[in-house]
Structures are given as C-alpha cells and as structure tokens.
Amino acid sequence: MVRLLAARGETLAVAESLTGGLVAAELTGVPGASRVFRGSVTAYATELKRDVLGVDGTLLDRRGAVDPEVARQMAEGVRGVLGADWGIATTGVAGPDPQDGQAVGTVFVAVAGQGAAEDGGQTRPESAAARPDQAVGGPGNTGAPGYALGGPDVNVVALRLNGDRAEIRRESVRSVLKLLLQRLSGERAGNGRAQDTEQNGGN
C-alpha cells in the first residue's frame, strides 16, 4: 500500500475512533511510510469528531458516533485537515457494551479520495469466515447501514464483526486498509454505498 501511494505521488491521512491509533501504527510500521503518511487524528471522544474533523454536530446528536455518515465525514474531514490525497476512517463499537444504540461489533470504515467510488461494484472485505450480504437501501435512505452516501468520491463499508474487543479492533484495521488497497489497485468498490458485511474478527 505504501509503495502504491508512493508510486502515485499521493498521501494519506487517518481518522480513528474505536481503533485508537492502530491503523496509524500499522502504516508507520512499514519502511518508507514517511513518504506518504501525513498523520492521524484519534478522535475517540465524540466531540473531537465534531471539533477537529468537522463532523456535523447535529448528525452526532441525532444518530451518535457509530454511523456510516459519520464515518464518511471523518474520512473527508481528516483528508482536508491534514492536506492529504486520501483519507480513511474507522468508527464502531468494540465492546464490551453497546454504544449509541448499536450492538457490539458494529463498525463502519470509510475511504475518501479522488475517484474513490467511480465504479458500480460492491466492496466485500476478505475473510475466510466472511458472509457478504447485499447492501440494502438506496439513494436518499438514511439512518441504517446500507444507505447510499452522498459524494462520488467516498466509499463506506458497514461491518458486523464477531469476537472479543481486541479481535474487533484488529479486524477493523484490516478492513479499512483493504478498502483503501482496493481503491488504489483499481478494484471495484461500493459506489459510495455502505456495504453491509458480517464476519468473524481476528481472521
């Protein structure tokens, strides 16, 4: 991934919530990451998503931090704040308790970048135990995983992860990086649609 970004002359910024810096740690563990990695914002507290990343406060009040539109705005926000070509984001519930009315294992990951969703395919994070489900809803639907998100340059994936807290966080890291890799590799992704996928964490 670092090589792909470097070859394209592009940069990356990361916004994290439930992963708490794990995505940034994974990226910076790769030699040469400094050529492409702009930095990260760990917006663990809900108000930081609003104050630092520019996520709409009314949206956060109405639907909470665990929401596909929040993930989209986090990815777009960190891309702008840190001046990167690409922004990626994670938000969700690692457990042990539900949050904002969402069950443990509910996770949304997002990628924002030029041409991030120009095709009509669907993103299915790879896992030996994955059971991809067709995205539900359509343009204009709101409030549930699977609704189409605004903006032609953002992909959001809704995950239903099984496992303990650590497994859910690890799988969230793997899934957002896979989504970015798919975009960089020119593979088909969800055309701005939140794709709902259930899988076991830790695979």
Where are these regions (language model features)?
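Short alpha-helical segments enriched in small residues
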Residues: M1-N203
